[in-house]
Amino acid sequence: MKSTLWHNLKLCAHGDPNDTIADAAIAVNGDGTIAWTGRASDVPAGYVHWPREDLRGAWVTPGLVDCHTHLVYGGQRADEFAQRLAGVSYEEIARRGGGIVSTVRATRDASEATLFEQAAARLRPLLAEGVTAIEIKSGYGLELASERRMLRVARQLGERFPVSVYTTFLGAHALPPEYAGRADEYVDEVCERMLPALADEGLVDAVDVFCERIGFTLAQSERVFEAAARRGLPVKMHAEQLSGGGGAALAARYRALSADHLEYLDEAGVAAMRASGTTAVLLPGAYYFIRETKQPPIDLLRRHGVPIALATDHNPGTSPLTSLLLTMNMGCTLFKLTVQEALLGVTRHAAAALGAGDRHGSLAPGRQADFAVWSAATLAELAYWFGRPLCERVVKGGVTVFARDAR
């Protein structure tokens, strides 16, 4: 590609709507990195005569980052949704062979090609909303071959779509049926066989665990973290979603990239996260879908200065959500986040939750030229509208990879 000067734009370079430039320009090198950003009147002489792209006064933000998803899995669970609406309990659905076990079964039965096809359909609407980086977890295979297949598909999505994919091994997501009553033995399998094999194949960027009464205990979670540490892999945790239990504090002790959900997080956990630099990833889609009533402790997170990120938590059981903009709206409406917090939560703070703050979430010299162009008069509209297509163009590595008027 050729070096380009993008001009006639309003710039929110670092995901903060309180830090913008009204008449800005972005100089992008031929290798897809940013050479310079700033006021149009201050363009350095070396870039003035570069070929130009006129954005007609549109807002530009960093490409959005969806930092918590379960995008790869077999099938879907709309039938269970209908059953729950008819009054059937989750426990009864599980007794009938539904719930997470049904997704595990569908994922194990699906070919790699089928998993890719289904995940690609879920990914496309996110890309059309300006997402340029995404995390994808395993965790619906719960045995080596299927977990490998999920992570391979996640890697393939990053190779075949214009998006940076970060993979997370979530073998400790649930207890597979064949290990019923033998949770410690399954954790042995995760730590001693699955994680080493998948890490050796280069399929794992981070390791996650579901620490909860219906998931894995603190002791079991710590074993997974120790196994990750032996491999030099960063960790993250599903913590305090359904009950308090010290999961976030444990995650902080291992300097986790993030602790996610956090509805039942207490002040000790918040303080530990602040001390360790662990990002709080809030998932309002799941909160909404399961009709949760206990909100994450937003005021405590603010008071302690813990960075807040937002993510779709796309998954078939509790958050079949493929819109990061709707996630922003939910974060503001349900959790009372400000527009500033919501936009930072899907840019700079979301990138930090992936350990990728030096690559994504901000537009600065030397970084990838990944940005979204918006049809909006103000940045508040990104969190205000839902169901309205606002993203006009997506640029990845300096190249336009999506344009609404070109579809």
Swiss-Prot record:
Which residues take part in binding N-formimidoyl-L-glutamate?
Y140, N315, G317
Sorted keywords for this record are: Cytoplasm, Histidine metabolism, Hydrolase, Iron, Metal-binding, Zinc
Which residues make up the binding site for Zn(2+)? Answer: H68, H70, H238, D313
Question: What is the UniProt remark on how the cofactor binds and its stoichiometry?
Answer: Binds 1 zinc or iron ion per subunit.
- Listed binding positions for Fe(3+) are H68, H70, H238, D313
- One Pfam family for this entry, by name? Amidohydro_1
Q: Where in the cell is it found?
A: Cytoplasm
Q: Which residues bind 4-imidazolone-5-propanoate?
A: R77, Y140, H173, Q241, T318
Requisite cofactors: Zn(2+); Fe(3+)
Q: Among the entry's GO cellular component annotations, what is one?
A: cytoplasm
- Keyword Repeat among record annotations: no
SUPFAM superfamilies xref list: Composite domain of metallo-dependent hydrolases (SSF51338), Metallo-dependent hydrolases (SSF51556)
Molecular function GO labels? imidazolonepropionase activity; iron ion binding; zinc ion binding
One example of a Gene Ontology biological process annotation? L-histidine catabolic process to glutamate and formamide
* Known pathway: Amino-acid degradation; L-histidine degradation into L-glutamate; N-formimidoyl-L-glutamate from L-histidine: step 3/3
Major location, coarse class? cytoplasm
State whether keyword Lipid metabolism applies: no
Q: Per the UniProt record, which EC number(s) apply here?
A: 3.5.2.7
What the protein does comes down to: Catalyzes the hydrolytic cleavage of the carbon-nitrogen bond in imidazolone-5-propanoate to yield N-formimidoyl-L-glutamate. It is the third step in the universal histidine degradation pathway.
**Similarity comment:** Belongs to the metallo-dependent hydrolases superfamily. HutI family.
Please give the name of this protein: Imidazolonepropionase
